[in-house]
Amino acid sequence: MAVVKKKRNVVVGRVHICATYNNVIVTIADQQGHVLVTTSAGACNFKGSKKSTPYAAQETVARAVKAVIERNGMKTVSVCISGPGAGREAAIRAVQACNLNVTSIKDVTKLPHNGCKLPKRRRV
């Protein structure tokens, strides 16, 4: 279930989507960065390996956006997406399908400049 903070009228906001290999986390905030709604695929009753699917990302974003439109009356958003997960494109498409004006889509995935050593590869 989406966690909704206060009820106040916010027309313009930001949607932060973190799509990892294991989960999808969606946070919707106003322009100042105050969080209005946050939810994840696990909170939307997707368990185990189903949390990282594109369908889970789509449903998670749809629930969060629906909650913020009902509660805060949001109309325009900019999307910031991070992480290498499978649900990236599905999450962006879900935001665009929810009757919100998307002003910008920004990829804020952090890339190392040869930083820490990666985990060893799985041998199956």
Curated annotation (Swiss-Prot):
One of its GO terms (biological process) is translation. The keyword rRNA-binding applies. NCBIfam families: PRK05309.1 (NF003698), uS11_bact (TIGR03632). Part of the 30S ribosomal subunit. Interacts with proteins S7 and S18. Binds to IF-3. The gene is rpsK. Keywords: Ribonucleoprotein, Ribosomal protein, RNA-binding, rRNA-binding. Pfam families: Ribosomal_S11 (PF00411). Located on the platform of the 30S subunit, it bridges several disparate RNA helices of the 16S rRNA. Forms part of the Shine-Dalgarno cleft in the 70S ribosome. It comes from Anaplasma phagocytophilum (strain HZ). One of its GO terms (molecular function) is structural constituent of ribosome. GO terms for cellular component: ribonucleoprotein complex; ribosome. Belongs to the universal ribosomal protein uS11 family. This is Small ribosomal subunit protein uS11.
